[in-house]
């Protein structure tokens, strides 16, 4: 009786394994980062984006290998090259990834008038000079685009940003937190595309 149970269990587990193995694994690779931040900081954000995609269930290919491939292909590029796909897509095909992700990280400061405090002081008749109501805001934004390697088409894009007053205690969202926000946005479109291809 126990042997029968073991045999049935083994067959059941084997069938489940075969069923799940039919679902192909989706792999993506992030392109070299772009934006207004220092390269070291941008790289930290790209690593966070990769981590967020991995947590969402996708495989993440070696970014440094992709960068090397792109550089090699750029150096070999000649005037008679077939331009049906650009270098990045060719590199993606060489790496056998399904998607390429471009990550742009921008950081900037801007001055804004604190209208809330100004209106409050006006009501109390203690209005100060306009310059005293100027606040400096720091903003960081991640913008990502997901390109399907097979078709060279943009299938998803999204952005997430955080802004803080520089003189106050609240700090900007961490790279991980901001990356999760933007990846959650684009995963909906990626899942739709995967479902469409499998049907």
What are these regions (language model features)?
Residues 2-14:
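Sec-dependent N-terminal signal peptides
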Residues 19-23:
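Boundary at the C-terminal end of the N-terminal hydrophobic targeting segment
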